[in-house]
Design a protein with these regions (language model features):
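Alpha-helical transmembrane segments
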Residues: 1-9, 185
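Active-site lumenal/periplasmic loops and adjacent helix-entry segments of GT-C-fold
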Residues: 8-167, 189-199
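Alpha-helical hydrophobic membrane-insertion segments
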Residues: 10, 14, 177-181, 203-206
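Hydrophobic residues in alpha-helical segments
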Residues: 36-40, 171-172, 210-217
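Membrane-interfacial segments
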Residues: 104-109, 172-176, 214
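Short hydrophobic alpha-helices at membrane interfaces in multi-pass membrane enzymes
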Residues: 167-188, 217-220
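Perimembrane helix-loop-helix junctions
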Residues: 200-220
Length: 220
C-alpha cells in the first residue's frame, strides 16, 4: 500500500522520457544503458570513457543492467526504462522506510507516519537554506535530486538502505537464515547501484548493531 501511494505521487515519472533538466547527469546513465543494450551482455571495453577503459570499471552495474533489462523486456527506449527503474525504486525506498520503522518499533502507526514524512518532506530544509531554496515548491530532497540532477543511482542505493537495515535488525534479533539472506541481498543491491549509498550503509550499520535488540537464544 505504501508503495502504491508513493507511486501515485510520482506517477508521471514512470512514463517520462527526456526531461528539460539541463543540470541533470542522467544522460550519462541512459547512454551507458544504451551502450550495454547494443553490446549485450557485457561490452568488456568502453571506448568513450577516460580515453578507453574496462566497462566494469566505470560505475556499479545495478542501474545500467536494470535499465537495459527493462528496455529489452518491455521494448522501452532506454530513457523511459531508466525513469521507470528509478521511479520504481524510489517508491520501493519509501516502503522500505515503513518496513524499517515497523520492525524497529513494532508500531504500525509510527511506520505509516515515518513513511509519509519520507514521501512528503525533507527535514534538512529546516537547517540547510540553500537546499530549501533550490527545491521547487519544497519538493522532498531525495525526489528533487533524482529529477533535477539525475541522481538515480544514488537514490536507488538509498532506497535499499532501509530494507538492508530492517532485515539486518531481524537477523540480529532472530539469527534465522532467511533475514540474514535478505539482508545480504539488500546490502549487495546498495553497493551494486552506487558507492555513496554503500558509504551511507557503512555509516548506519554500526549504529544498527549498537541499537539492535538483545539476541534471542538459538533454539535446539
Amino acid at each position: 500500500m505504501v508503495f502504491l501511494l508513493t507511486a501515485a505521487l510520482v506517477r508521471p515519472l514512470f512514463k517520462a522520457k527526456y526531461l528539460d533538466k539541463w543540470a541533470s547527469i542522467e544522460s550519462t546513465f541512459i547512454a551507458d544503458a544504451r551502450f550495454l543494450i547494443d553490446h549485450w551482455p557485457h561490452p568488456q571495453w568502453q571506448p568513450l570513457w577516460y580515453a578507453g577503459t574496462r566497462f566494469d570499471y566505470i560505475y556499479p552495474p545495478g542501474l545500467r543492467y536494470g535499465t537495459a533489462l527493462i528496455a529489452k523486456a518491455a521494448g522501452y527506449w532506454p530513457v523511459k526504462a531508466y525513469h521507470f527503474y528509478t521511479a520504481f525504486f524510489y517508491c520501493f525506498g519509501i516502503a522500505g522506510v515503513y518496513l524499517l520503522v515497523r520492525v524497529g518499533t513494532r508500531s504500525r502507526r509510527a511506520a505509516w507516519l515515518c513513511a509519509a514524512a519520507a514521501a512528503l518532506m525533507s527535514p534538512s530544509f529546516v537547517f540547510l537554506t540553500p537546499m530549501r531554496r533550490d527545491s521547487w515548491m519544497l519538493m522532498p530532497l531525495r525526489l528533487g535530486v533524482m529529477v533535477k540532477y539525475g541522481e538515480g543511482p544514488h537514490m536507488t542505493a538509498l532506497a535499499f538502505i532501509p530494507i538492508a537495515l530492517a532485515f539486518s535488525w531481524l537477523a540480529l534479533e532472530t539469527r534465522r537464515l532467511a533475514p540474514i539472506a535478505f539482508a545480504a541481498v539488500a546490502c549487495g543491491a546498495v553497493v551494486s547501484n552506487n558507492f555513496y549509498g554503500a558509504t551511507a550503509l557503512a555509516i548506519f550499520y554500526p549504529v544498527l548493531v549498537w541499537r539492535a535488540p538483545a539476541r534471542k537464544p538459538v533454539s535446539p
